[in-house]
Amino acid sequence: MQRLLPLLLLLLAPALPAAAQARDDVFPYALKTERLPNGLTVVRVPFRSPGLVAYYSVVRVGSRNEVEPGKTGFAHFFEHMMFKGTKKHPEGERDRIVASYGFDDNAFTTDDFTVYHAYGPTAGLDALIELEADRFRNLEYAEPSFRTEALAVLGEYHKNESRPELKMEERLLGTAFQKHTYRHTTLGFYEDIKAMPEAYAYSRSFFERWYTPDNTIIFIVGDFDDAAVMKAIQEHYGPWARKAAQLNMPTEPPQKEKRTAHIDWASSTLPRHVLAWHTPAGSLTTPSAAIQSVLAAYLVGPTSPLYKELVLEKQLAEFIGSDFYPHRDPHLLNLIATLKAEDNRAAVDAALTRAVRELASGKVDAARVKAIQSNIRYGLLMNLEAPDDVGVQLALYAGIFGTPDALSRHLQNVSRVQPEQLVAFARSYLVDTNLTVLTLTPANGGKQ
């Protein structure tokens, strides 16, 4: 799967009307939350969408959980295997039933969690609940099917490595991280993917350890009968009885000096330049995630002086931005530039560095900070036009922060960020000893 999370988390749109801005509760829809005795959290969100419902299952397992040497890529692999079937619904039957109702049905994997989602008619909701509960409880696949899908995952890697982004991510993470599992991508290390067909027994244990009710949150958004939904949920998910494994997460040691990494890209593309600093984990009880969300937009967002200078006026860069989003453990805040030519690299690097140092010196535009806060907070809410929009945003933030109301609480934290907090954060974390610089130079030198 392509990593769409940064785009989904950083949706920007015009501000909401003043009446909506005045709400104390920044999320406009009620969450009805119940935790079953087995630990499964079920969240229902009534939404005016006659005849339509979105169904999101968030499993808090991602590439972060892959701590065993030689066993990376399995969180993503299970995104594939979860569509294989069960004894009750053999391979292909679930797809046929889902398609017969007209559901859109898919999944995606991230560093920290995996999401399964379906969107379609309420008339098929009872059938969908039974199908989803069955595969989460009773997934079955034979070793030949496992081997076939493992080869498909290897093919997915080969497809992705033809683009610069995968190799850039691999090199950046492998340079910035020495111990933590964030040092590999969601796809996993290439050697581990090649060896995956021989790991059938391990795959079964991975499923048993992480696909558990106490590690899963379900969001149901749209037009449905709440009592009937909860009755079906309790009937089909109630017998699910596994418990999530305990994880001994390796701690990343502090970085003590600037690191660099370079890629010579064999084919024609534009040069790339990335600055990345280690920053704190996402949390709803501290301001770090909210500060970084605002800070990324402040430094390189489309309203930033840097964007105006480098992209619009001097045209040294095709694009500047950041794909920052919060992580469960300390990760990276990055600034990314796609250069129009290799000759522009020094000037772009100098401009990015200057902007960071100016902020750390105390120079901050309070009015622009406030505008960015409004755009992040209300712009995202303006995009909640359909049950599927609501479901995906709730799922993404719940996957990161581990609580159903994470989206609302994060947006509240964003609204509380003060300009001086950006300055203090830059002084503490955006320093050279904490920095990794990644450069990519294409074979043509970036000349198009």
Which positions does each model-derived feature cover?
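Non-catalytic, conformational "gating/processing" segments within enzyme and secreted inhibitor domains
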Residues: 150, 165, 202-236, 434-435
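N-terminal secretory signal peptides that target proteins for export/translocation
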Residues: 1-2
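Short, polar/flexible loop-turn hinges at active-site or ligand-entry regions and domain interfaces
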Residues: 84-89, 136-144, 364-365
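His/Glu-based metal-binding/catalytic segments typifying zinc-dependent metallopeptidases
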Residues: 58, 158, 245-305, 397
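M16 family metallopeptidases and their MPP-like homologs
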Residues: 45, 49-69, 73-77, 91-136, ...
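N-terminal post-signal-peptidase region of extra-cytosolic proteins
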Residues: 27-29, 57-62, 204
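Bacterial N-terminal signal peptides
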Residues: 5-15
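Proteolytic maturation boundary segments
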Residues: 17-44, 225-265, 272, 276-278, ...
